[in-house]
Swiss-Prot record:
InterPro entries: NADH_UbQ_OxRdtase_su1/FPO, NADH_UbQ_OxRdtase_su1_CS. The chain crosses the membrane at residues 13-33, 82-102, 115-135, 161-181, 190-210, 242-262, 277-297, 317-337. The lineage of its organism: Bacteria, Pseudomonadati, Pseudomonadota, Alphaproteobacteria, Hyphomicrobiales. GO terms for biological process: aerobic respiration. It is a multi-pass membrane protein. It is found in: Cell inner membrane. Belongs to the complex I subunit 1 family. Keywords: Cell inner membrane, Cell membrane, Membrane, NAD, Quinone, Translocase, Transmembrane, Transmembrane helix, Ubiquinone. GO terms for cellular component: plasma membrane. Its EC number is 7.1.1.-. It catalyses: a quinone + NADH + 5 H(+)(in) = a quinol + NAD(+) + 4 H(+)(out). This is NADH-quinone oxidoreductase subunit H 2. The keyword DNA damage does not apply.
Amino acid sequence: MADLWTNYLLPLLIVIGQSFLLLTVLLITIAYILLADRKIWAAVQIRRGPNVVGPWGLLQSFADLLKMVLKEPTIPSGANKGVFLLAPLVSCVLALAAWAVIPVDAGWMIADINVGVLYILAVSSLSVYGIIMAGWSSNSKYPFLAALRSAAQMVSYEVSIGFVIVCVLLCAGSLNLTAIVEAQNSQYGLLGWYWLPLFPVFVIFYVSALAETNRPPFDLVEAESELVAGFMVEYASTPYMLFVLGEYVAIATMCAMGAIMFLGGWLPPLPIAPFTWVPGVIWFTLKLFFMFFMFAMAKAIVPRYRYDQLMRLGWKVFLPLSLAMVVIVASVLQFAGLAPK
C-alpha cells in the first residue's frame, strides 16, 4: 500500500495540483491579454477602450465571462447537436493541453519532455479539427466556408513554422524547450538570443503564428464582410466563450513559443545585477506580453489580406524562404564549426 501511494497516487496528486494551478494562472493571464488586446486597439484608434467595470476597466473580461455564462446556449434546429457542442470543447482543451510542456522558469513546467516543441506543434495542429467540426455541424453555409478556409490556412502556415523549428533545433541541438532556453544563455545577454542571428526566421515565425492563430491581418476565417462571424455564426453563450478562450490560449502559446525560441525564455536581458535579481517567471511574462503587443499592433494597423494573397504568401514566399534558411543555417553551423555537440 505504501508503494502504491509513493509511486502512483502521490505523483498523480502532484500533477493534478500543478495542472489546476497552471490552469488558474493561465486563465487569469488570458483575461488580461484579452483586455490588453481591446485597450491597444482602442489606443491606436484614439479611444479609451473598456474603462467602466473595475478600476481602469481591469475587471471587464470577468464581467464578459459572467455575461456569457448566464446566457442561454442556442442550437440550430438542423445542427448535429453532439458534434456542435463537442467542437468548442475540443478547440479549448487542445489549446490548454499545449501548456503542459511550456517552462515559465527553470524547472517550472508540468512535463519536461525531450520533444516539447514537436508536442506543441502536434497539439496546435489538432485544434483545426474543432473548427472543422463547428463549421460542418452548424448546417449553415457561412460556418462551413469558414471551416474550409481555416483548414487550408492552418495547414499552409504549419509547414513554415515546422522549418522555423528546424532552424532553432539546428542551433540548440535539442527539441527540449528548457535546453533551447539554456542554449541561448551567454555572457552577451539579449545579443546572444536567437532573435539576432536568426532574425529572418523570427519574422517568418511571427507572421506564420499570426496566420496559424487566425489573427488579423489573416483573419479570413472570421471575415465579417464576407462570412458574418465565420465558423462561430451559430454559437452563443458558453460554447462561443470556449471558442474565444481557445483562440486566445493558442495566441498565448505562440507568444510563449516565440519568447522561448527567440527571446531567451526566462533569461534576463543582461546577466548582471540588478537584472538577475528579478525572478525568471517575471522576465518570461514580460516577453510573452511583448510578443502579444506585436500581435495586437498587427491587428490594429495592417488591413486584411485577400484569400489568394494569404495562400500566395504561405506557399510561394514563406515556404521557399524558410527552406532556404534551413539550408543557410545548417551550412553556417557546419562550416564555421558552431554546430552543437
